[in-house]
UniProtKB/Swiss-Prot annotation:
CDD domains noted in UniProt: CLECT_REG-1_like (cd03594)
Tissue localization of expression: Expressed by keratinocytes. Highly expressed in epidermal keratinocytes of psoriasis patients (at protein level). Constitutively expressed in intestine. Low expression is found in healthy pancreas. Overexpressed during the acute phase of pancreatitis and in some patients with chronic pancreatitis.
Subcellular location: Secreted
Protein name: Regenerating islet-derived protein 3-alpha
Outcome recorded upon mutating K93A: Reduces binding to phospholipids and membrane toxicity. Loss of filament formation
Keywords tagged on the record: Acute phase, Antimicrobial, Disulfide bond, Inflammatory response, Lectin, Secreted, Signal
Species annotation: Homo sapiens
Induction: Appears in pancreatic juice after induction of pancreatic inflammation. Induced by IL17A and IL33 during skin inflammation.
Disulfide bonds: C40-C51, C68-C171, C146-C163
Presence of keyword Signal: yes
Length: 175
């Protein structure tokens, strides 16, 4: 039998081992974010702790990101998981539009100078741990340096695109 003082430390050690084991086995942490407990402005939808809105008035990538930054903690959407990607896809598809591409917050400020496409980053500065490229831009002879969601992939996959083209866009923000 363990002395009373050892019980909390053993419990903590067991919990730490279980958490480490789930990471080592490659088990994805929670697939779906908890249901939203935030209120979002009209025309936007909640997912996790953020609001998301699709804007159909086309803008260049830079102008779209600047428009998103006018909202609290806003940027063009960063897609950080497959579950979030599915949510954004359903948001874009729920509002009928004739566009083939929609801006997201991924861009390559190095304009392809980093090897193997490593210059890509989210405008929100979120860490890139999830990738959903339609085709890896480092394998394309003349890639664009901004990313869009592509209708041909049901708005689930990313495609590099010319940053100056005017497209609809998705903002992610808090409210």
């Amino acid at each position: 039998m363990l002395p009373p003082m050892a019980l909390p430390s053993v419990s903590w050690m067991l919990l730490s081992c279980l958490m480490l084991l789930s990471q080592v086995q490659g088990e994805e942490p929670q697939r779906e974010l908890p249901s939203a407990r935030i209120r979002c402005p009209k025309g936007s939808k909640a997912y996790g702790s953020h609001c998301y809105a699709l804007f159909l008035s086309p803008k260049s990538w830079t102008d779209a990101d600047l428009a998103c930054q006018k909202r609290p903690s806003g940027n063009l959407v960063s897609v950080l998981s497959g579950a979030e990607g599915s949510f954004v896809s359903s948001l874009v598809k729920s509002i009928g539009n004739s566009y083939s591409y929609v801006w997201i917050g991924l861009h390559d400020p190095t304009q392809g100078t980093e090897p193997n496409g490593e210059g890509w980053e989210w405008s929100s500065s979120d860490v890139m741990n999830y990738f959903a490229w339609e085709r890896n831009p480092s394998t394309i002879s003349s890639p664009g340096h901004c990313a869009s969601l592509s209708r041909s992939t049901a708005f689930l996959r990313w495609k590099d695109y010319n940053c100056n083209v005017r497209l609809p866009y998705v903002c992610k923000f808090t409210d």
